[in-house]
Amino acid sequence: MRKTKIVCTIGPASESEEMLEKLIKAGMNVARLNFSHGDQAEHKARIDTIRKVSKRLGKTVAILLDTKGPEIRTHNMKDGLIELEKGSEVTVSMTEVEGTPEKFSVTYENLINDVEEGSYILLDDGLIELQVKSIDKANGEVLCDVLNTGELKNKKGVNLPGVKVSLPGITDKDADDINFGISEGVDFIAASFVRRPSDVLDIRKLLEAKQNKNISIIPKIENQEGIDNIKEILEVSDGLMVARGDMGVEIPPESVPMVQKDLIRQCNKLGKPVITATQMLDSMQRNPRATRAEASDVANAIYDGTDAVMLSGETAAGQYPEEAVKTMRNIAVSAEAAQDYKKLLSDRTKLVETSLVNAIGVSVAHTALNLNVKAIVAATESGSTARTISKYRPQSDIIAVTPNAETARQCALVWGIFPVVKEGRKTTDALLNNAVATAVETERVQNGDLIIITAGVPTGEKGTTNMMKLHLVGDELAKGQGIGRSSVVGKTLVVKDASELEGKDLSESIIVTSSVDETLVPYIENAIGLITEENGITSPSAIIGLEKGIPTVVGVENATSEIQSDVLITVDANQGKIFEGYANVL
C-alpha cells in the first residue's frame, strides 16, 4: 500500500467526471480547490462532482479549500504591459494609477509604512527586482531603483522579502470563502500567507462561530516571518503546507531545501500532517514524463518525512493530469520501498516526545516491526488512534476503521492510513470482530495474516486508546493442547489405523487420528505434524510428538470426524490451535 498521500489541484483540466475518476483511480487522496481562481459557483460544482465520483467508486477523497490570502498585487498597466529597464527609476504609488515605466501602483496601501530605504520589492514571482531609494509619505509614493530588466503585466504578485508587513490574517474574501467551505462541509482549509499564530486564530474564530469542529486548518508557510514563528503557528494549527513557490521568492532559493526539512521535522515531532507543495512535477504541465530532478525532489520530500505531496498546475491546467498523478504515485511507492523502517522507527521514537498518548502508538509500531505483522487495524472514533500510530511510520499498513465519514476524510491526508467507514459497535468483542472483518473486506489482509488490533475500551469514547491485541486472521478449525513450540503447514490425512498409511508419501502430511499406538509410530516419524483426540501431556501422542520434534496438538475433540482429509491447514503447537489454510503464526 502506498503510504504517502497525494493532493491534486482541481481545475479546468481535471473537473470533469471522467477525469476525476481517472485521478482517484490513479491515487488522488485529497482534492484541492484554489480560491485564488474561479468563483464559489465553480467550486461548488467541483465539490459536487468530486463527491459524486468518489461515492460511486467507494473511495475516500477529502476536500481542501485553499484561500487566496492577503496577497499584494500590482494594478493594471497601460496597454496591459510595461517594460522596466535596469538602471532606471520607477515610483510605486499607494494610490491606484494606470501603470507606466515611470509609475505604477499596488493593492496594499500600507506598503509605504512597512518598507524602508534599502528594502527590496520583488515583482512577478521575483522576475523583476526593485530596491527602495526614497519614501515620500506625504504623496504616498516610494521611489525605487530597477535592478534588472523585465516586462510587468497586469495584477502581478508583489513580494517584500525580509519585511514584516501589517496585512490582515484573512481578507473579507477569505472569510466569505471559508464560510462557503463550512456550508459545503470541506475537510481542510489551507490558509495562505500565514505569518503569525493570530492569522490561524482568525480562521479558528470563524469555525467556532459556526460551531464547526471537523475542519482542520493547514497554514501555508510562504515567507520569513512565518518561518520565524513556526513553533507558535504549529501550536494552534492542525497541520502545515510547505508552500515553496512564494517561499522561494521571499527567502533565498538555496535556503528552501533546508527550511523544508526543518518544517517537516517539526510537524513530524508533533504528529501533525505536512504537505510539500509547488513545482513538484512542474514540467508535466507540458510533457508526459517528469524530469529526473523532479523525481528526486518528490522522493527526497518523502525521505524528509512529508505526509503528502501536492500537484498544482500539473492537474489543474496541465496537459497530462492523469499521468502526473500516476508518476507521483510510482515515485512514492519506489521511495517507500527503499526506506529503512527499523531505523525510521528508532529515529521517530527519539523525535516524538514520550507521553501516555504516544505510549500505545510506539508499542504498536515496535510490535508490528518485530513480528512483521501484515497490518495494524485501528478502531477509532476521532482518528487519533491511527494518527498516533502513524507518527512512528510503521512498515505495516494502518487500516483505520471508523463510524464517522468526517474522520475518514481527515485521515486521508495522514501518512500510511487507509481509512474505512464502518458502523460502530457497542461491545469490545463486537468492536474487534468488526475491525477484523472490515480489514479483510479491504483485501489488504487475508486469512493467515497476523495483524494488530488497537482501540479504546470502553468503546465509543474519544481519546481512550488503551488496548493492543495480536490477532491471526482466519478460521480456527479446532483447538486442544499443544505439544512443542513450533508450527507447520500441510495437507491433512485422517486415518483410523496404520494400514491406511502403507505406501503413502507422508513428507508433506499432517496425520489426524483418534489415538496413537506402536503401529502408527513409524509413519508418524515421516509426517510433518500430528493431531489426535486423546488427552494429556503423558499420552502416547504427546510423547511421540515431543520425542520426534513434530508439531502436535492433542485433546482435539471429534478431530477425525470434523477435520477432512486433503485439507491445507496450519498446526500451531505453541497455542494448541489449528487453522484452515496458511496462517502466519508466531
Curated annotation (Swiss-Prot):
Recorded catalytic activity of this chain's protein: pyruvate + ATP = phosphoenolpyruvate + ADP + H(+)
Site (Transition state stabilizer): K220
EC number: 2.7.1.40
Keyword check for tRNA processing: no
Binding locations of K(+): N34, S36, D66, T67
Organism domain of life: Bacteria
Keywords from the named record: ATP-binding, Glycolysis, Kinase, Magnesium, Metal-binding, Nucleotide-binding, Potassium, Pyruvate, Transferase
Record carries keyword Kinase: yes
Residues reported in the UniProt entry to bind ATP: N34, F35, S36, H37, R73, K156
Chain residues that bind Mg(2+): E222, D246
Pfam assignment, any one: PK
Residues annotated as binding substrate: R32, G245, D246, T278
Similarity field: Belongs to the pyruvate kinase family.
Name under which the protein is recorded: Pyruvate kinase
